[in-house]
Amino acid sequence: MFFVLSPAKNLNEKDPAPVSEFTQPDLLAESDILMQQLRELAPQQIAELMHVSDKIALLNAQRNAEWNTPFTPENAKQAVFMFNGDVYEGMDANTLNTDQIQYLQGRVRLLSGLYGLLRPLDLIQPYRLEMGTAFANLRGKNLYEFWGDIITNLLNDTLAQAGSNTLVNLASQEYFKSVNTKTLRARLITPIFKDEKNGKYKIISFYAKRARGLMVRYAAEHNITDPEMLKNFNYEGYAFNDAASNESEWVFMRSEQIK
């Protein structure tokens, strides 16, 4: 069983990682191709392409200019500690122990517009390139065309090497669209997190993102290898709802008063 997650736009570049172990991204040669093109963009072009402020555009122009290989602990940081959004706050990898970090490294993969597919301890340098960005490149009009089947093939190889046949999709639609489900050789399970608001259960983005990270933390803390055991996930008041679920979409609900 493997999990896939989206990355985060917010990055924690300052705080040192709590572990020294690191690996290198498998698709770094592809990242280098993209970065060569990104470096050609002026800050104003970045602002228009990514729909960001001038300040953020300038920051990322500087990041692109400084991006260089090889990655080392001195110029890069492990992805799971660099990403700093809602998902990663829910996961809170900084407070996991060594065995739990190894669980993440062995069973979690992070999708990325620039890096394709990452292990949690893969070193990355700061960047901003969301998968849905309409960034024309030498392979097509966007990043989905750039990555093609590269991400899916690596996922299939990863699953095969581990003898696993289940992929738990905790990524956003924007990112999971980079995976070709027709050629993915795995059973696909997509957890859905709903919160009660005014008497109705609905997906609330902030809570759903945090819950994805919480589920990965739950799996790591309980060393879960059987997907069925994920149905026992109960962090922060969530509970599996069998009636609302089906074979591929597992719904977890949380009542309003529990938060």
UniProtKB/Swiss-Prot annotation:
GO biological process: response to hydroperoxide
GO cellular component: cytosol
InterPro entries assigned to the protein according to its UniProt record, in alphabetical order: YaaA
Descriptive protein name: UPF0246 protein NMC0835
Pfam families: H2O2_YaaD
Family, per entry: Belongs to the UPF0246 family.
